Regions:
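A short helix->loop->beta-strand "cap" motif at the edges of active sites that frequently abuts
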Residues: 62-64, 90-91, 112-114
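Hydrophobic residues at beta-strand termini and immediately following loops
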Residues: 118
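A short beta-strand/loop micro-motif in the catalytic core of glycosyltransferases
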Residues: 90-98
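N-terminal pre-catalytic "stem/leader" segment of glycosyltransferase-like enzymes
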Residues: 1-54
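Carbohydrate-associated surface elements
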Residues: 99, 121
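A conserved, positively charged/aromatic
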Residues: 80-91
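Phosphate- and divalent-cation-binding pockets in alpha/beta enzyme and binding domains
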Residues: 102-106
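Active-site proximal beta-strand in glycosyltransferases
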Residues: 48-76, 94
């Protein structure tokens, strides 16, 4: 449970969020809870899973940085995707739909080679 606890702690301590993770029950937050509930702890070893936030402070150089995006392109929390410097620090950007992925590619010109689309987990 060490890896899952690390991810949850980081999500809850993210000050760039308008509301703490523990107090938020939006779709993206609930999908993260569902993912953590059903995958074994070792699945998250060496992974820095970042939910809907492009805060530079959340990047961990020694881990694989995965930004999981559920927000739309106009949300303040993800505006750093417009920064090449920030995007270069990410290993993967995961989207919850093809539609959302296409909007981000158009808006931020993010590299498709760093992007993946998964369907909603719930």
């Amino acid at each position: 449970m060490e890896e899952k606890s690390r991810i949850l702690k980081k999500a809850n301590e993210d000050q760039s969020r308008p509301i703490s993770f523990n107090d938020s029950f939006g779709g993206g937050d609930n999908q993260l809870r569902f993912l953590l509930k059903h995958l074994p702890d070792e699945s998250f070893k060496d992974i820095n899973l970042i939910l809907n936030s492009t805060n530079h402070d959340l990047i961990e150089k020694e881990k694989i940085n995965v930004l999981w995006v559920h927000h739309f392109v106009n949300q303040a929390e993800i505006t750093n995707l417009g920064s090449k410097e920030y995007v270069d620090k990410l290993d993967w950007i995961v989207f919850n739909s093809n539609w959302n992925f296409e909007k981000f590619v158009y808006q931020f010109k993010i590299p498709e080679s760093k992007s993946a689309v998964i369907r909603n987990a719930i």
